[in-house]
Design a protein with these regions (language model features):
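Secondary-structure boundary elements
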Residues: 159-225
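Hydrophobic/aromatic-rich core segments of domains that either
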Residues: 234-298
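Secondary-structure capping and boundary motifs in well-ordered enzyme cores
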Residues: 218, 225-232, 236
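Residue-level detector of well-ordered alpha-helical segments, enriched
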Residues: 147, 188-192, 236
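Extended, well-ordered protein cores
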Residues: 149-155
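His-Asp-centered catalytic microenvironments across diverse enzyme cores
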Residues: 270-272, 276-344
Length: 344
């Protein structure tokens, strides 16, 4: 990184609430269509022209595994629809305000607030769905509602999205070759941290203009990291999550009111990672790499505020109790493991 970055930057865009009416483009998808065993689900995907074997590895199932069956059903429906967008040239749904969104999902037993929370956790757990924006649509069909994500304008049309998908996969595969050469999970996580920080710089101009050009900058998506050279915290965190999971390392992205960072599991213990705060104007560092919760909460009041997770993460998050002792110039050393990690 060579561009000037404001120290300790954030840049998470808040989720915006939009409304829309069901249209012909909303297929009769029900949550019950996707509560099937793995074989039936695979057959459904194949019948839609989908091959998800190279993509599903990038997402995290840690929070999904803690959900109720009704919550999982809603997640499964969104997952199948997004996988179709990722692996086919199907067009997204045109919205009444001139944008694009996912197809709606009907038949859920979830209340509106729970549906929103599941949708948010789904989005932050699946960085491979780079086309998802930050608008959460409530789609109405009579008295029934569905909560689904808006889609970046450039990715609404299937043929154009297919080109973007190829670009995302090409960069991920290029990085994967370097990551696979590392001998341990710890070294792989360090390599992922370094690759991201070395490739991109913090998009301060976008933050300064209040994200007015977000529709063409993609800062809230992994696309900004893999296919451009600038991003904000959301891009850093989702890229780290994607490449860790793709390398067989459990990682999740979590959010506060203004920031996004990661928690990663190594040797059965969880650690915090903040690539954004490690990427500084003079280069990249390791002060926020593989740290425990106590460090993030005590190194400064600003850090504590920025790393206070939003309320919908409550009861899902693992405790990060061990610390690498990293510093600005060294990535630290993981301590001897004495017990099992807290779930997820």
């Amino acid at each position: 990184t060579t561009a000037v970055q404001q120290e300790l930057s954030t840049g998470l865009m808040p989720v915006t609430e939009e409304t829309d009416e069901a249209v012909d483009g909303d297929e009769e998808y029900s949550v019950y269509d996707f509560t099937q065993d793995d074989t039936e689900t695979d057959n459904l995907l194949r019948s839609a022209g989908t091959d998800d074997s190279d993509w599903s590895k990038y997402g995290s199932r840690d929070f999904y595994n803690q959900m109720t069956e009704d919550e999982k059903s809603y997640w499964d429906a969104m997952d199948t629809i997004c996988m179709e967008y990722l692996t086919t040239e199907g067009n997204a749904v045109n919205t009444s305000n001139g944008g694009y969104r996912m197809q709606a999902v009907w038949g859920s037993k979830l209340d509106a607030d729970t549906m929103s929370n599941v949708a948010k956790i789904f989005r932050y757990s699946n960085p491979q769905y780079y086309f998802l924006g930050t608008a959460l649509y409530t789609v109405y069909r009579g008295s029934e509602i569905s909560k689904v994500w808006g889609i970046y304008p450039a990715f609404g049309v299937g043929a154009e999205r297919a080109e973007a998908t190829d670009a995302v996969k090409t960069q991920a595969d290029t990085w994967q070759q370097q990551i696979d050469s590392c001998s341990t999970g710890e070294k792989k996580a360090e390599k992922i941290h370094d690759l991201i920080c070395d490739k991109v710089y913090y998009n301060q101009a976008l933050v300064d203009n209040n994200f007015s050009t977000e529709n063409t900058e993609y800062s809230q998506s992994v696309y900004s990291v893999l296919c451009t050279d600038k991003t904000v915290c959301a891009g850093y965190a989702q890229a780290f999550e994607m490449m860790c999971n793709g390398s067989g390392i459990d990682a999740v992205a979590v959010t506060s009111y203004n920031h996004e960072w990661n928690k990663v599991r190594l040797y059965d213990s969880w650690y915090n990672v903040d690539c954004t705060w490690d990427d500084q104007s003079g280069g990249f560092y390791y002060n926020y790499f593989l740290r425990n919760d106590e460090y993030y909460d005590t190194c400064s009041q600003y850090s504590k505020n920025c790393h206070k997770e939003e309320s919908y993460w409550e009861d899902y998050l693992p405790v990060c109790s061990l610390d690498s002792g990293s510093s600005w110039n060294t990535p630290g050393t993981l301590p001897e493991i004495t017990g099992k990690a807290d779930n997820p």
